[in-house]
Swiss-Prot record:
tRNA processing listed as a keyword: no
Primary gene name: ALS3
PTMs per UniProt: The GPI-anchor is attached to the protein in the endoplasmic reticulum and serves to target the protein to the cell surface. There, the glucosamine-inositol phospholipid moiety is cleaved off and the GPI-modified mannoprotein is covalently attached via its lipidless GPI glycan remnant to the 1,6-beta-glucan of the outer cell wall layer.
Name the UniProt record assigns to this protein: Agglutinin-like protein 3
Lineage: Eukaryota, Fungi, Dikarya, Ascomycota, Saccharomycotina
Composition skew (Polar residues), residue ranges: 930-941, 947-965
GO CC annotation terms, alphabetical: cell surface; extracellular vesicle; hyphal cell wall; plasma membrane; side of membrane; yeast-form cell wall
ALS repeat ranges, renumbered to this chain: 365-396, 401-432, 438-469, 474-505, 510-541, 546-577, 582-613, 618-649, 654-685, 690-721, 726-757, 762-793, 798-827
Region described as Disordered: spans on this chain: 892-1077
General function of this protein: Cell surface adhesion protein which mediates both yeast-to-host tissue adherence and yeast aggregation. Plays an important role in the biofilm formation and pathogenesis of C.albicans infections. Necessary for C.albicans to bind to N-cadherin on endothelial cells and E-cadherin on oral epithelial cells and subsequent endocytosis by these cells. During disseminated infection, mediates initial trafficking to the brain and renal cortex and contributes to fungal persistence in the kidneys.
Originating organism: Candida albicans
Propeptide section residues: 1099-1119
Cellular localisation: Cell membrane; Secreted, Cell wall
SUPFAM superfamilies: Bacterial adhesins (SSF49401)
Amino acid sequence: MLQQYTLLLIYLSVATAKTITGVFNSFNSLTWSNAATYNYKGPGTPTWNAVLGWSLDGTSASPGDTFTLNMPCVFKFTTSQTSVDLTAHGVKYATCQFQAGEEFMTFSTLTCTVSNTLTPSIKALGTVTLPLAFNVGGTGSSVDLEDSKCFTAGTNTVTFNDGGKKISINVDFERSNVDPKGYLTDSRVIPSLNKVSTLFVAPQCANGYTSGTMGFANTYGDVQIDCSNIHVGITKGLNDWNYPVSSESFSYTKTCSSNGIFITYKNVPAGYRPFVDAYISATDVNSYTLSYANEYTCAGGYWQRAPFTLRWTGYRNSDAGSNGIVIVATTRTVTDSTTAVTTLPFDPNRDKTKTIEILKPIPTTTITTSYVGVTTSYSTKTAPIGETATVIVDIPYHTTTTVTSKWTGTITSTTTHTNPTDSIDTVIVQVPSPNPTVTTTEYWSQSFATTTTITGPPGNTDTVLIREPPNHTVTTTEYWSESYTTTSTFTAPPGGTDSVIIKEPPNPTVTTTEYWSESYTTTSTFTAPPGGTDSVIIKEPPNHTVTTTEYWSQSYTTTTTVTAPPGGTDTVLVREPPNHTVTTTEYWSQSYTTTTTVIAPPGGTDSVIIREPPNPTVTTTEYWSQSYATTTTITAPPGETDTVLIREPPNHTVTTTEYWSQSYATTTTITAPPGETDTVLIREPPNHTVTTTEYWSQSFATTTTVTAPPGGTDTVIIREPPNHTVTTTEYWSQSYATTTTITAPPGETDTVLIREPPNHTVTTTEYWSQSYATTTTIIAPPGETDTVLIREPPNPTVTTTEYWSQSYTTATTVTAPPGGTDTVIIYDTMSSSEISSFSRPHYTNHTTLWSTTWVIETKTITETSCEGDKGCSWVSVSTRIVTIPNNIETPMVTNTVDSTTTESTSQSPSGIFSESGVSVETESSTVTTAQTNPSVPTTESEVVFTTKGNNENGPYESPSTNVKSSMDENSEFTTSTAASTSTDIENETIATTGSVEASSPIISSSADETTTVTTTAESTSVIEQPTNNNGGGKAPSATSSPSTTTTANNDSVITGTTSTNQSQSQSQYNSDTQQTTLSQQMTSSLVSLHMLTTFDGSGSVIQHSTWLCGLITLLSLFI
């Protein structure tokens, strides 16, 4: 039951809701507040605050009733609210929804619904404030083009309507202060779409545009173009706010993507300007940046290119609100006969409710009676207050008498005659009684028909006379086979068509062919009157015609047509006498002179128009004694200066005193144009001003000026709302963190910049299963440690097995840098018998001479001599050897260049000194090369082995081998070198001595050179050649640490690498050379001796030199 009752109430409320009008009854004010930083008070610049008066009467309005305020030319409501309540003393009496027109309608509406708080005893009234922006155009849409004509700069009347109730107010709109001749841009937020409509109008070209490119694109990736909502057109004009008022199509090419919209156009006529607009979506519609393309060529001008970038910011929304008072109506019954209204005392400063008392008379009930008579009578039965009185109304009525008569009309008519003095009225009824009718039809000479009725007296016969024009006649002539002519006439009824048929014998025929203007052939037969000759006309399309007009010396015009055969081309030759020429000189606005010849049609007059730039004008104004003004213009020839002489009577003078910004007083006389009033302006220094800017809690800014007395100090107090803050964190090169606050101007956004020191970085290299390398950087939060993870593919592995003196086996893995080759060295043990049988170290050269390839080698040898307190001196010799393998892979010295440097100092250079005070350092260097023939030296070597420790077999001596050189005829001297080498490997010592004699074509010296070489090693393991790794660093040598001391000025014998470093050894071998043993190093060092020395297990030295010497000697003949 309760549910049914509720549904019934809902049904009744819906059924009884209605539309009411006139609620908004006044337009109280329309004021502008600058919601951003606009430079002028235009209708489309937010925010315009409209204050409207409203009134709701509970006796005529009910809950659920609706009313609507239409607001023409309003674009949107500049508020984040979707509705506003009509309230009085905090009570809501209606709710109004905002419906913005935006780009969809030329008007906005406020649709309101009455609340349940309104009762019949309440009348609420008040005001509502609506923040809004008007629509005066901004795009090429039909809505904006229509609204672009809503207002003009200056005084306008703004009118809203609530049903039939119109409310209006006058307001002044300021014109845009942007120069309309330049490029024009505009952006406008569309709140319902959360998009922005952006407009770009090209700069003005008064004579039109030859070509151009225009458009806009996002700058920082925070904007997207909506290519489905674009307008491109040319406008004939702009309104006072620089918006198009029309849009016409023209020829252009459009390119659009989400990043930008661009158009390229050509040939825009004078008086028009191209424009493009589009919807854009921005990350923040209140702050975004656009880059504009702006290229154009004005007709008769040069190509212009002026791109630019604009940053757009939004405006501050306002709030809508309402307030009012409540009026309570009370009713009281009185004994008066009429209703009266009275207002009880009301103090608006103290009372919140105004009470209106309605004084009503005692209610009555009316009873109506009737009687036969003439007058109406009233009688009242009274009653006390609280009851109902009775009013009796006695209404008269009449009786009727009917009279019937006949008449000649065709209908029956009834007429009632009311008797004002009696109760009996008369009803007259007229019944039709027609006469019999006779109709007569006759023809007459007129071209139209008439009908005339002649009415006889009642009871006689009426006559209807119809007069018809004669029938039309159609004459048909046809041929028949007879040789004579016949004529037959067929008469039709009146109004029809009579037919006359003439039958003729056939005519003879003549055929004629002619040309006509159509592109096809027709055949027409023209039948002549009987007895004549019929014509058959064949019309052929004409030949094409070429017309040539030329001028000739005669004074008359001739036209000659040369007819070609059918299907060819006819030629029309027009010869015209030359036209007369009229030359006109005129001035124009440009700074240069042009001559234009306008060719008239033949027989006309050609015009030569010379346009000259206007002469500069010098105007001289002088006063004279007369009371009137005169102006005299003295015109000079073109290119000179015109003079305008103005003579004026003296002006009246007015003196004005004002303040200005300087600290001193001045008197200035401003001379007005003649006939006006001159002004004497006295400027006094103003009071000093102190400006104070402070922030407050409100969302808007205010400026208050406190003016002090003259000579005091004025105060300007600016109160700004607090700025928004954006915090940015970035890294910098310092080791500490800083926080900087950049305060923007009021109304913008402050920036808090946090600078953090860079994080420490830990690099980790690991191997993985892939065949390629990757580098991944893991960024940690500020103050922590970043990680660089390098993943390398696994290195290939080489396994080497060696024997050592320990009793156990071990394996060592030498990991190369990524991209190199890892080495696994297995150290295996040997039995006691194997150790005793292996009493001498056995060195075997596994690399023969012809399998070693040296490409480039550079060596520097330094001799240092120190004598007591006299200091030291040294000589540096650098040698570069370039070898090229032949077809049997035997290295051959192709050129050698030595450079010698001698220096001395009181301090000895760094290095290792022998007992004799001589030191050698070797390093790589690059010198200039020159070709020379190598020599074959004579070599004597002696090798002595001395063993200590477990091996007691004593020294061994090898036989000497002498190799005599085949001396060159140009050899001037020989160099004898004695070498002594000592090697200490664990408990064994190997000493090698030798003497070398060789010729040298490079060093001119008569003194023999002596070289001592000492090498020490601390391990019996194989000495590995140090190589450069792929990364450019040095690879560590094996367990050996050789040290060499050499004395030499020139050394063409020892080419192995020596080092003064006790822990590392350097080598100049190529990185791809195989590992060598000590014996291999010695072999390599003796290459230039053209001999091979091999150490065997017994301590002997096997020297192979004879065949090698002969081979190199033979090869040297071809170098």
